[in-house]
């Protein structure tokens, strides 16, 4: 056992003395040491309840003959960090999470790890750490929030955080009063858990099942459901079996597992952020995978779900309809069914054991919402290295669009123009210098897209950015444009009025300029000057790579 480095031999007497100070006895030193990586915090609704999850994990570890040690890492609530300086820190927190877990696990010689994430950057940060450390590991997330209930005119409707973001645009346009907004604000987030739609956090928690790193139910069992606590106890027990069998993350997260994750992703219509995060996990796992492969998967994999923001259903509905297992059951012809999982069974075996889909929340593969998956990576002279769009959330009339560019060099300037009524039907908003280096931190453009949707412009206006989008975004929103403006990508050459062509069906994103004209303009673009010159974001700017490779740090 790795923990023998701190337990065995006379030279480890000081180590044992310190461990005895924790309450351990001689018998404890014969057992595996398990690190419990908790991301509990009192400021994030998705993490406020994770102490209860951790206690259940400890019970499982103890019952199976191990010793659990809980430690914490950071967690950012993207909703609270949205639309101010805090959003610059959200994506960069992913690397901090991975690094802090690495430090704790290596410093204390754990034999295995149980990860307890829930929200957006915590899941991929922990997955990256698991691959980097490559010791037996298992994930159990905190679970999704229930949808809120809004009563209006004797009618009750299901609402969520995205409802509030879009309502701001409705208020700005005079379609909703501030009093009505307040009533919505009060009920949209009714308790603990990750925000209730197929937004980034829930996308990543669901994909963790498809990657093979979590037990069935991880992605969909609500945070307040007793089955979540039972799942946590089972995860604590299962880590002991993984240690016994010496099954490590890199045995599980292979190119086949990445294939399965993206297959599930496009079937669910998951967040575009998943592309960034799964590519980063693949990098840490040494699993070679390209953006072009995502398009090949999406071309042949049906879109089976219309979950918020793409449709009316929430994660609780997905859970009631069979959960991720039922989606995987429909996807079996497109999966790598022999891929291993932490359960000890293959992904195909788990799919076989799942209940049949209901053909409502989870459509049959023979009756999909679309024969093609929910994500697409667009290429062209505007995005030579790719740009990601959630096509399942794009209105049919915007799948192909041609319009004049409206250029903004920050989210704030674009937001001001939208609120001021300066964006017209047919326009293509371009928000640049918001990429990994340019932002820095690749902020989410949820406020601009929510305003457009709330104003009813999401079927008439497209938005292109080298920044990111929230999983709650809907509309013709192309993000992750690579190379970014700060790296002198073609997006930096655009000027107001340039005609932009979007063809999602054929994976194309281009501007009606010759290569010569683009290069001529780029030659006159000033050298990018970093916006932040101190602290962690200075380090981040100097070391982060392109969104096309997951915005990981330089090797």
From Swiss-Prot:
Cofactors: [2Fe-2S] cluster; Mg(2+)
Q: What is its EC number?
A: 4.2.1.9
Q: Where is the active site?
A: 470 (proton acceptor)
Return the Gene3D superfamilies for the record: IlvD/EDD C-terminal domain-like
* Pathway, per record: Amino-acid biosynthesis; L-isoleucine biosynthesis; L-isoleucine from 2-oxobutanoate: step 3/4; Amino-acid biosynthesis; L-valine biosynthesis; L-valine from pyruvate: step 3/4
Positions of [2Fe-2S] cluster binding: 119, 195
**What does the record list as GO biological process?**
isoleucine biosynthetic process; L-valine biosynthetic process
Tell me which InterPro entries the record gives. Answer: Dihydro-acid_dehy_C, DihydroxyA_deHydtase, DiOHA_6PGluconate_deHydtase_CS, ILV_EDD_C, ILV_EDD_N, IlvD/EDD_N
- One Gene Ontology cellular component annotation held by this UniProt entry: cytosol
* Domain of life according to the entry: Bacteria
Q: Which residues carry this modification: N6-carboxylysine?
A: 121
The positions annotated for binding Mg(2+) are 78, 120-121, 444
- Cite the entry's keywords alphabetically: 2Fe-2S, Amino-acid biosynthesis, Branched-chain amino acid biosynthesis, Iron, Iron-sulfur, Lyase, Magnesium, Metal-binding
Q: Which Pfam families match?
A: ILV_EDD_C, ILVD_EDD_N
Q: Which reactions are catalysed by this chain?
A: (2R)-2,3-dihydroxy-3-methylbutanoate = 3-methyl-2-oxobutanoate + H2O; (2R,3R)-2,3-dihydroxy-3-methylpentanoate = (S)-3-methyl-2-oxopentanoate + H2O
According to the record's subunit comment, the protein's assembly and interactions are: Homodimer.
**Which family does this protein fall into?**
Belongs to the IlvD/Edd family.
Question: Per its database record, what is this protein's job?
Answer: Functions in the biosynthesis of branched-chain amino acids. Catalyzes the dehydration of (2R,3R)-2,3-dihydroxy-3-methylpentanoate (2,3-dihydroxy-3-methylvalerate) into 2-oxo-3-methylpentanoate (2-oxo-3-methylvalerate) and of (2R)-2,3-dihydroxy-3-methylbutanoate (2,3-dihydroxyisovalerate) into 2-oxo-3-methylbutanoate (2-oxoisovalerate), the penultimate precursor to L-isoleucine and L-valine, respectively.
Q: Which protein is depicted? A: Dihydroxy-acid dehydratase
Highest classification ranks of the organism: Bacteria, Bacillati, Chloroflexota, Dehalococcoidia, Dehalococcoidales
